[in-house]
A protein has these predicted regions:
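Post-transcriptional modification and biogenesis factors for structured RNAs
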Residues: 1-166
Length: 166
């Protein structure tokens, strides 16, 4: 008998307080990417995702995240980002820029809006000018960037690691 027993689903960890991170997504080409982001948000007890454009979830991919995450669909991101900033959120873009901080060295503020760009164009200039900071994930091989859902997952995980109790 192995010392490890497979557990299909462990109960979720209990947080001391709700997470204060919002995921704000530019219009995406693929509903699969948005659905993957919502699934990860649900797993990490993030309750709010803002999606722009013709966003639709694939519930088979988003799974329980489709039921536990509040998804707001907006036409464009700039007005949303201005609202979040007025509500005290620090606007952090996930993008490779000349001033990007390394994700592994960046200290998130508890009240963060993580701004995610389009799969092809990333964060456009009208969004970049509104941000307080940008973070990027080191790439050690090719291609030169990660899939948007994979990169968002890594950034969410880093935030949750820094605020492990909520």
């Amino acid at each position: 008998m192995s010392e490890f027993e497979h557990l299909r689903h462990k109960p979720p960890a209990i947080l001391d307080r709700p997470r204060e991170i919002v995921i704000a997504c530019a219009p995406m080409k693929s509903n699969i990417n948005l659905s993957r982001i919502v699934r990860v948000a649900g797993c990490c007890a993030i309750t709010r995702v803002i999606a722009c454009g013709n966003a639709q979830l694939d519930k088979k991919i988003a799974r329980d995240g489709a039921d536990t995450v509040q998804i707001e669909v907006r036409r464009t991101l700039p007005p949303v980002l201005k609202e979040l900033k007025a509500d005290g959120y620090r606007l952090v873009g996930l993008e490779q820029t000349t001033g990007s901080a390394n994700l592994h060295e960046y200290q998130f503020e508890r009240r963060t809006a993580l701004v995610i760009g389009n799969e092809r164009t990333g964060l456009t200039e009208d969004l970049l000018v509104l941000l307080d900071a940008t973070v990027e994930i080191p790439v050690w091989g090719l291609p030169y960037s990660y899939n948007v859902a994979s990169a968002t997952t890594m950034a969410i995980y880093e935030y949750c690691k820094q605020f492990s109790r909520g």
